[in-house]
């Protein structure tokens, strides 16, 4: 980690500006040779000519950040040049020719971590912030990058250290009875701490589900209007629509966004009794999709009375016990479907929508609202967020240890053991891992210039 490294810090491609970043003991010397300028005041921007082997490459902006007051904690130099990919690579190559090494993925951030400029929670936040596509999460990630998760964990750790110290004092005077007020006070303190951890964990789990996307299966018997519904929601002809039964023989998946939530639409084969082997396989996949989805859109044909196939679908819906939106299609035709019978057989949470123009704006707006009603309401204001499986596992283990400690309040040695184990798990959220392999895995998610 003592090498001087260099990399392009901006995305590849043409643009107004590209940034070449250098970090290490030799960074300033390399900048001086590139610019043929000897004096750089830290944190001042200089317009400089950039040279390579005495050949002028560009007129650019150069900034020097003196250690330890830089992102990495080392001497850092930035060259903000014109955004030509060829020019940028030539400037980077000039840095390498002068003794810098090409940075590995995430190596700048790794230097920042090892030089105590950032902790693990801030590193995790910066990774997720770069990859984030959900506007509602940006605030939580920005607060984590600012260090608020670290502060939250440090406060919890300090509270637990106080409990541990009190317990150790009582162990030294083990011949005396444990004061009842101590037991009550510690029990309440642990309950409060466990509740705050669970709140963080629950919010993070819900946000993870939101990022993954809600799976929405569209089912119904053949020609009920499933594919028309999918096409209307996508605003394109994604699925083939035909009067011939069994046209859709496999599931079709597409992703849309509804009110800030990612939704995976799954159009399925029409459910009916069939002798066609391929169609039967499609129907089996349709029924399987009900097990794996979060919400169901079940399309019924209002112009036809309920048939055996409809009741088979209703039975399948009831077995899933999942929320359902019942779409009653073709209400412009003479209604023959026994609506009250349908309602009486449904044993799951559902809402209902009638339409015959599945591509109408009013219908789609109504349908979107009904779908969104099933989404969990996430209040992201003033919320912290766990951004990795490692963080989640560490906090879950800490909660388990605190619950164990609460169950052993009257056995101080066991109580202290579980409190100490909880503290060790909290350390994993913000403090260094013991293995370089885990560090390398985490930092490899970054680009070269980060």
UniProtKB/Swiss-Prot annotation:
GO CC annotation, single: cytosol
Protein EC: 3.6.-.-
Sites where the protein binds K(+): 223, 242, 244, 247
Binding site for (6S)-5-formyl-5,6,7,8-tetrahydrofolate: 21, 78, 117, 450
Keywords carried by this UniProt record: Cytoplasm, GTP-binding, Hydrolase, Magnesium, Metal-binding, Nucleotide-binding, Potassium, tRNA processing
Binding site for Mg(2+): 227, 248
List of residues binding GTP: 223-228, 242-248, 267-270
PANTHER family: TRNA MODIFICATION GTPASE GTPBP3, TRNA MODIFICATION GTPASE GTPBP3, MITOCHONDRIAL
NCBIfam families xref list: mnmE_trmE_thdF, small_GTP
Function comment: Exhibits a very high intrinsic GTPase hydrolysis rate. Involved in the addition of a carboxymethylaminomethyl (cmnm) group at the wobble position (U34) of certain tRNAs, forming tRNA-cmnm(5)s(2)U34.
Protein known as: tRNA modification GTPase MnmE
